[in-house]
Amino acid sequence: MPRQTRLQKFMEILRQQRPTLAEQYNVATLEVFGSYVRHEQRKNSDFDILVTFSKPPSLFKFVRLENQLSDLLGVKVDLVMKDSLKPAIGKHILREVVPV
């Protein structure tokens, strides 16, 4: 059986945590993008997650979620709200997202 890639491992952890994240933080969707999706990550790369919420969080709760995800995955997470994407960069991000 082939060894799981870090991306696959992270995706599995996120899938398992989705119900809890939905309950605690009102997370509606999670999608990943960036260097891990392109298989260009380096040792110090962060893990980029695009998130939508069923109810917008406070800044404190958003940062707490980002920190909790970093702790769960064991790598720095860069959490981006889908609603806040700027059109110029957003179209590039949306081309490579992988839903969790």
PLM feature spans:
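Conserved histidines in hydrophobic membrane contexts and catalytic metal-binding motifs
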Residues: V32
